[in-house]
Amino acid sequence: MHRRHFIGSAALATLLPLVGGAAAIAAPRGRLLPAALAPGDTVALVSPSSATDERLSLQLTQEAMQALGFKVKTGEHYASRYGHLAGTDAGRAGDLNAMFADRQVKAVICVRGGSGAARLLPMLDYDAIRANPKVLLGYSDITALHCAIHARTGLVTFHGPIGAGSWNRFNVDQFRRVFFDRELMQYHNTVDAGDELVPRKNRTLTITGGKARGELIGGNLAVLTALAGSPYLPDFKGKILFLEDVSEAPYRIDRMLTTLKLMGALDAIAGFIFGECTDCDPGDGYGSLTLDQIFDDHIKPLGIPAYRGAMIGHVREQFIVPVGGRVELDADAGRFRLLEPVFGQA
């Protein structure tokens, strides 16, 4: 994602050979489940990352939450701007802290991603988050929040549509099934041949066959990798790692997976799911590795169940995935399923 100006991955890999988090930060004991959601609850809209360019997008976000049956509360700075960011770091972090501390708010919905969420991680009140476990929803740059909050509190958070994104029929159905019906979800792609002889859209590819069980961690590859050497990555041991990205040339994907390899993360995981890498074609000029070759180099030698093509990432229709949820991955079938509930009491 070209607007993210991070330290180079090769330099990050030399900081700390961590599997997850710095030794000085104690890992939480067990998972922390968010309170269940219901129509009529109050949800908060916050902007932890980039500013939203158009007022209409903010209006549509509020209308979408109301159409889902919620009362809406907005962060003080959710419509602010500071450079490309939605306000200052202190203002954006303050909104997150206030909404987690507010007992009337049952979920925190991120308006958009972009960049800047990682700047907030030292300013978050993890004790307040731990004391008020609630739904956090977003993706892309919100990966920084998913990683840090899960690492520091054990809270299960949700990688899925942003408030200003598309609330199409598929995404609304996912939302209701995950949050209102609290299904033990079966995540398998919707495949439609359309006018093609054989289906092309939403196809999955097995990298290494087999089944594995573990807790899901992951999100956007660039954002997650940029946290290397910090105390804000969860432990990778025995986990099912899911990743996605957008507008990254294959050589960048290769470099970031190399970082995860060098820091010990890839050798620790039990399974691997890659979603969509939207607009990740090689550029002009020198030759390029293909994504197939990159996954064959980095993932296949691990010998763990792995597949690519899941409906996760910068796509119009996307899964709502619980970060910290316990799942079973079936790489041959290109699907995974929840094994346990991911909500506590309402």
Over which residues does each language-model region extend?
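N-terminal secretory signal peptides and thylakoid transit peptides that target proteins
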Residues: 1-17
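Conserved anion/nucleotide-ligand pocket segment
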Residues: 158, 162-220
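C-terminal segment of N-terminal export signals and the immediately downstream linker at the start
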Residues: 20-52, 56
